[in-house]
């Protein structure tokens, strides 16, 4: 089990992604998620994809199929709703995850399996899920996507995820906290920090409040 991608839910139909492009991050292709009601903009680092996610179809996002994901609430900017999602990947499709799950099988996966979603967490904390083996942004279909980098640094060395949630971390989030280079904790703001490059750097760029994202290199 390892990190595959991180999403940030936004309410402006992805326009805040322009901030990343204007900063100089190369952008990959976007997707429309049939049956899920969302669309995205994607930025591919060498080992991790950053996804700007928004709701395009309210009816699909609030349907009985998709509503349990909480994407409508997360992208609506409501106080107390976490905008973050943590996507995991596995090499072995039979690998048992270290937390209880339920299966989300949207049409856009085309029968290539289901997304395994962590149980026990509400929308006040990041959504933890595992994509089907081989179906994520680092599968063969996306091998030629342009890679994002900052000052030549394209490898995400550390991820810090700060959340304003007022509840203890759930089992799925605690399990992800055990991964090397990842740390989730409670704080006074929602903020995702990506540390790039081989060692500690002194430079930073914060895109808040438009986007709860900070890059350090």
Name these PLM-found stretches.
Residues 1, 34-35:
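Short, glycine/acidic-rich beta->alpha junctions
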Residues 1-3, 9-26, 45-217:
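Glyoxalase I/VOC metalloenzyme domain signal
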Residues 7-8, 31:
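Residues that cap or flank secondary-structure elements
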Residues 28-34:
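Conserved catalytic-core motifs of GNAT/GCN5-like acyltransferases
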Residues 35-39, 188-190:
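Short acidic/glycine-enriched loop/turn segments that link adjacent beta-strands
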């Amino acid at each position: 089990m390892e990190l595959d991608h991180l999403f940030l839910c936004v309410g402006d139909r992805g326009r805040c992604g322009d901030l990343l492009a204007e900063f100089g991050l190369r952008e990959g292709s976007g997707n429309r998620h049939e049956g899920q009601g969302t669309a995205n903009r994607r930025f591919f680092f060498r080992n991790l994809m950053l996804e700007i996610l928004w709701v395009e179809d309210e009816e699909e996002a609030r349907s009985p199929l998709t509503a349990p994901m909480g994407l409508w609430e997360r992208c609506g900017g409501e106080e107390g709703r976490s905008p973050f999602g943590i996507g995991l990947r596995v090499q072995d499709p039979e690998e048992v995850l270290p937390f209880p799950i339920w299966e989300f099988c949207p049409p856009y996966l085309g029968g290539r399996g289901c997304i395994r979603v962590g149980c026990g967490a509400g929308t006040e904390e990041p959504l933890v899920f595992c994509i089907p083996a081989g179906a994520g942004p680092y599968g063969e279909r996306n091998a030629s996507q342009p890679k994002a980098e900052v000052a030549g640094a394209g490898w995400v060395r550390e991820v810090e995820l700060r959340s304003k949630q007022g509840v203890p971390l759930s089992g799925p989030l605690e399990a992800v906290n055990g991964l090397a280079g990842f740390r989730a904790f409670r704080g006074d703001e929602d903020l995702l920090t990506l540390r790039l490059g081989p060692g500690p750097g002194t430079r930073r760029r914060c895109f808040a409040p438009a986007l709860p994202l900070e890059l350090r290199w």
